Amino acid sequence: MAKASFILLGTLFLFGAIASIQAKEDLKEVTHKVYFDVEIDGKSAGRVVIGLFGKAVPKTAENFRALCTGEKGVGKSGKPLHYKGSKFHRIIPSFMIQGGDFTHGNGMGGESIYGQKFADENFKLKHTGPGVLSMANSGEDTNGSQFFITTVTTSWLDGRHVVFGKVVQGMDVVYKIEAEGKQSGTPKSKVVIADSGELPL
């Protein structure tokens, strides 16, 4: 009887562990794919394809997806709610590349599809390595349209910035962008999202 109970408990523990792993994997399930076609000083640098984690952070993922397509039209700022034509305004080697300010172009602006700012959805996903897509902010619950893509592990940002996607193709392009950066963050060249949109899964 005791042996049977031990086997049962062991089986339950195993299933519990598998379920826990599966739950974590589900959070990282790609629900949408979007792209940036990037130009550096007017010359094509290639395409970055990003997978969005819509199950883990649906509101944050939807904001980014819609800003890639431009489907929401013009925002309260009077500017199109669209990443197309916007710059990577802050690039720091061995850290990240930041963009998404389509209203000011210098890191002082941006706008979400929900209005100016929206709350941090959750911090379930972590900054585990290069290619992680996360929301840039100016403090708690100040998400707009600005985002960054990591080029290294940035675990100190966990719990402070909402992770909502990953680069699934084109990390070579991300590294090309990174090479245009300086420790001050000011790019050496003009790095622009020449086009953006959504791709089929």
From Swiss-Prot:
Transmembrane intervals: none
Pfam family for this entry, one: Pro_isomerase
Activity control: Binds cyclosporin A (CsA). CsA mediates some of its effects via an inhibitory action on PPIase.
Alphabetized CDD domains for the sequence: cyclophilin_ABH_like
Keyword entries, A-Z: Chaperone, Cytoplasm, Endoplasmic reticulum, Isomerase, Membrane, Rotamase, Secreted, Signal
Broad enzyme group: isomerase
Superkingdom of the organism of origin: Eukaryota
Name of the protein described by the UniProt record: Peptidyl-prolyl cis-trans isomerase CYP19-4
Function: PPIases accelerate the folding of proteins. It catalyzes the cis-trans isomerization of proline imidic peptide bonds in oligopeptides. May be involved during embryogenesis and organ development by regulating the folding of EMB30/GNOM, and thus, by modulating its activity.
Induction: Up-regulated by cold, salt and cytokinin treatment.
Signal peptide, first to last residue: 1-23
Any one GO CC term of the record: Golgi stack
Location in the cell: Cytoplasm; Membrane; Endoplasmic reticulum; Secreted
Tissue specificity of this protein: Ubiquitous, mostly in aerial organs (at protein level).
Family to which the UniProt record says this protein belongs: Belongs to the cyclophilin-type PPIase family.
Any GO molecular function: peptidyl-prolyl cis-trans isomerase activity
Lineage: Eukaryota, Viridiplantae, Streptophyta, Embryophyta, Tracheophyta
Domain spans labelled PPIase cyclophilin-type: 35-198
Single GO BP term: regulation of protein refolding
EC identifiers of the protein: 5.2.1.8
Catalytic reactions on record: [protein]-peptidylproline (omega=180) = [protein]-peptidylproline (omega=0)
Oligomeric and partner information: Interacts with EMB30/GNOM.
Major localization class: cytoplasm
Species assigned in the record: Arabidopsis thaliana (Mouse-ear cress)
